[in-house]
Amino acid sequence: MIIKPDDRWRWYFDDEQQKLMLDLANGMIFRSRFPSKMLSATAHQSSPFTVDDAALYYGYDEQIRQIDMPSESRAELALNALIAHRFLKPLMPKSWYFEVSHSSTRPYLAQVVETALKDSNEKVLFLVAEVGEQACLCLLAQPQLALFDRTLTFCDPLKIMNDRLSEYHKQSEPRSFLYEKVI
């Protein structure tokens, strides 16, 4: 599925589903994965899909292309990153799951980054949805991540301290996204 932002797209909140929706104006509707309690007050008001939204979407999509994933998943991750950037309430960092990175990189918006789990040193992929001075709001860019106290699924948000993030290198990708979906 290839989607192209359009000036007829619009954001609205669906009271029945308690989710932010994006009307794609072609009979398709994208439903955000974030529950109502995570969304800011502006998410509950209808608004147009702006030129800035389109620019962010294309920025996320371009960076996500580094990861071996189907176009549907790429669009889902890009749209959820855009929603996280625009409409998510602030989150507190939860960096205790990850090792401090030895490479000093300054994360940038829409960057695909990796981090290593403290207990296993397993590499984990995230997409930077929002950059902060000390920490970034990131979305999980792989099918699943088992942590010691919970399991994250694709597109789940986590705020991570910048010193835990490192530049993603394709050859170090832990597994193919396509095979994870099949198994």
Swiss-Prot record:
Subcellular location: Cytoplasm
One Gene Ontology cellular component annotation held by this UniProt entry: cytoplasm
Protein name: Cell division protein ZapC
Gene Ontology biological-process entries: division septum assembly; FtsZ-dependent cytokinesis
Keyword Cytoplasm included in the entry's annotation: yes
Subunit structure: Interacts directly with FtsZ.
Pfam family, one: ZapC_C
Keyword field: Cell cycle, Cell division, Cytoplasm, Septation
